[in-house]
Amino acid sequence: VVEKFAALSQAASVVASPQLRNRGTIGGNLCQRPRCWYFRGDYACTRKGGDTCYALGGENQYHCIFGGGACVIVHPSDTAPALIALDAKVRIVGPKGARVIPLEQFYVLPEKDATRETVLEPGEMVLGVIVPAPPAGQRSGYRKVRARGSWDFAMAGLAHAVTMKAGKVASARLVLSGVAPTPWRLPAVEKL
């Protein structure tokens, strides 16, 4: 994992605290709920089906700068951006059977449905993650900026998977963390 999937290794190494990393799962990290104090508090906010995002006019220094709209939560996972940069898929199982989808399609923006973070249906759960073998010449990584040295969410982070051929960038996947309701891919930058 360290050699072939450095982005995942680096992201997993900065999740929460050592105690939580040793007990948690990738599925749990992918599916964790947002950390917005209005959502976590007693407010009937947009995320809970109300008609107001209290963070828009209140305490919002840790909320999104991209893709918010009706709800400005940020997605808290460190591993999701890394896995999306690595073009991973997620295996989902539930009462209606199993399915596999690209992890990039797993998350739901508030503009589509402000009450959901993922496409999981009732009774479904993440069974596993499928990460394809990296192409020759690919290098990946993850860097996270946070207020404290450990056990803190990303204020911003970047996962990258860049493939080089003949000394030139053949392809790049760049995904931000801590700045949007979902891991935020940068397709315009990838094309440069």
Predicted features, each with a name:
Residues 1-192:
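C-terminal structural segment of proteins
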